[in-house]
Amino acid sequence: MSGEESMPDEEQKQSEEEEEMIRKRTLAMRKKVEEIMRNGAGLVRESNGLPKAGADYELYNSYPTFNTFMKRSEQRLNALMNKVTKSIGCAMRVPDVGSSVEHYTECVIEAQDNIAERAATLHEALKKAELDEIVKVPEFITKAAPTNRKTEAEVSAAMRTFSANIGTVLAEKFRERREEAAQMVVLEKPQKTYNISSDNSQAPFSSKLTVKHHAIEKRTGIVLHDDDESGRRDWISAETETEEEHPYIAEILHFKVPEAQLKSAECLKFTALKDTPLTMIDTKEKLEALTKTLNSVKEFAVDLEHHQMRSYLGLTCLIQISTRDEDFIIDPFPIWDHVGMLNEPFANPRILKVFHGSDSDVLWLQRDYGVHVVNLFDTYVAMKKLKYPKFSLAYLTLRFADVVLDKQYQLADWRARPLRNAMINYAREDTHYLLYSYDMLREQLLKQDTKDLANVYSESSDLCIKVYKKPVFNPKGYLTEIKFRFTLNTRQDYALTHLFKWRDVVARAEDESPHFVLPNHMMLSLSETLPRDVGGIYACCNPLPYFVKQRTGDILKIIVEARDVKLEKVGLSAKERNDAQEARGVMNDTMDHITSVLKSKIDFSHTRFDEERGEIYIDKTDEGMDIELKDHKESLLSVLQTAEIPSVETMIVVEKGKKSDNQKVKKLLNELDKFVTPFECYQMMMITKEKQEEEERKEAERKKLEEGDLPKTMFSHHDAPINRKPEFDAKLLNVDTLKLVPDDPNKPKDPEPSPMEESSSEPQIFDPSRFTDDQLLSKKAMKRKRDAARRNIDVSVVLGESSSSSDPKKKKSDDDAPVEDFDYEKADSSAFEKPVRDNNADFDPFHQKYRLKNKTKKNMAMKKSSNRQGTINYKK
């Protein structure tokens, strides 16, 4: 007894020592981190004190000593960065000495990304280790064991080495996966090898069901009508009516869950995988034997492996079935036309079929083999009903069977034959533990609520009613598949529409998926760039798809036709945009002025909300505690008003009360997310106001144009001239001072004129001396006045004469002086016999510079001529 009691004490002491060691390591790590942060801050301060490029750095760098020191420092820093990154398993791409700052920045950012990625990988590995979701340990073959046993220190050192070199280990695993993928290459499509036909046309889907097993008799004399008020079924077309016709619709609607499935029963433990027999079904005889076996059991688990990339409609590659005692794997390729005989056990309402995530499996069985399911239990639906944190099959198996599933072949190409042992084991594990998991889920549902189990069966039956529909080509389907990063013009839209149609036609003809023929990003790149030749097409498609290379001429023809389309920038209509958003499930809520005013996130007028803190608290102290509705004017926010933790007494009252559905809170939170803020309301109001003002302005302009009151702003030479009114000085307030002739104070004033005399009187004359010529005359009149002043100048134009003989006081303008007759007999005719004066001697005040130049040239010519004649003047 003393020895047994000492063992727990030793274990407790050892655990305390481990905790103390972990605490010390944590404190040491924190000190190191703080030291690194302090050193980093000092490094930043020191680096800020260095000369800056573009300021003093060039001046300092002109000295050889500084230049040499900087190069050596750069080499030392590069070596340190390389050493640090290598020590943590992320070698850095160190730049050469003298590289630009941009190059250094790029290398440092790349190193930071690698370090962050490695840290995330290690963190994920630690989280999986806590949840026991680690990679399965391979089975070791028993051999001669070494005599020397490794100590705990050596084991911990080996683990640290593995942690430090995790990148190398992952690279090795990737290399092994590439080798396995090379061995699993499918040289020929199963559709050709096994002569599997598929209908890829636009025709509606027709069921492959040949014999309807377990059919119920239809009651005669009962007619069901499901029409609208007008008596017509306008909402169902002939095509949808054919496709939506489920062969077992009556059997599923009248299905009642057997009483044994609604009661508690013993959970039958599964047998070990290696102790369970496995049968491969690849012939018709084996398939018939399997059908008899399934008809004799009460329940079995089913799972499918599917391939979508190299088939237009898809291809079921493997069917896994597990009973309580045996596992079966069906290879459907050799017996494709005979798998339909499984419809007998699958449609039997007395046999339970257990699936996990059966929404797609049910449709694939209908499409390929004509097999329909009745009496289904979906473990995924049950996990959702029990509100598990995860809903995957791996989590379900880990929770109940304590087995970690290896999901490395989840996305493998299941068309490859022969199947590898690892792939066979992966397929077995998907159904081997499913029946035991069903037992555990059933008991938990019954323990939670008896209605929950019935609800799971009801929701599973809704999945069975689903009918497979063939994909119908939509000319505008690319709007839902492709996320655009730019606005399409008419040419790009033409190219994208026709490439999308061409891809669908080729995929249907060759039985390939549209994405295999031409991926979305390549189709978008071709439509955006519109290459002119084959080389441009190949540049947009990298790596080059097989059918693009084979049918380059068709693609080039579409692009050439797109280039001939008239170039216009068009956008999506509101209907097309809404249809695309609805197809993606991102339908935006329309918000008008009234709803934006009524719905607001921060309207707390009906609640006891603390506006100073600015928060709404939801009590999460107890997951099962119901939230009580408050009768504060029936406000939507009333359920969110409890900001303090309730007391124990309050919690007891709530627990004893009627439990409300927690979905109400989620629904209200979703409603709150749709509400708009006051600033968003203000923005919407401003946009509406701007639109209204713009419409009013356009309407006013339209009315003015119709009425002809809009003043003319553009003129041409055909328009009549406009008399410019003189500008008056605002300081001249007395109109009498502007009169040309002042009034005589001695003259008696005239009596007031009559209205007739006032209307016939002449307009008042103003004194023009109070205005400048620029204010009274136009530009042309000013030019004429300057020309006249230049012609009628009073300065003498003859050198030597003091003034003109004419007296300016006696000179009158042509307008004022009367025209007199000239008597030529009295004129002095000797005036015409005088010699002509020199034109250069005339005085022209506007051309004096030309006169001086000519005079200078003339004097220089006279000097040269005198020098040639030898006349030299000497000074006495």
From Swiss-Prot:
Domain of life: Eukaryota
Compartments where found: Nucleus; Nucleus, Nucleolus; Nucleus, Nucleoplasm
Gene3D superfamilies the record matches: HRDC domain, Ribonuclease H-like superfamily/Ribonuclease H
EC number: 3.1.13.-
UniProt family annotation: Belongs to the exosome component 10/RRP6 family.
Sample GO molecular function, one term: nucleotide binding
Name of the featured protein: Exosome complex component 10 homolog
Residues binding Mg(2+) 1: D303, D361
Organism of provenance: Caenorhabditis elegans
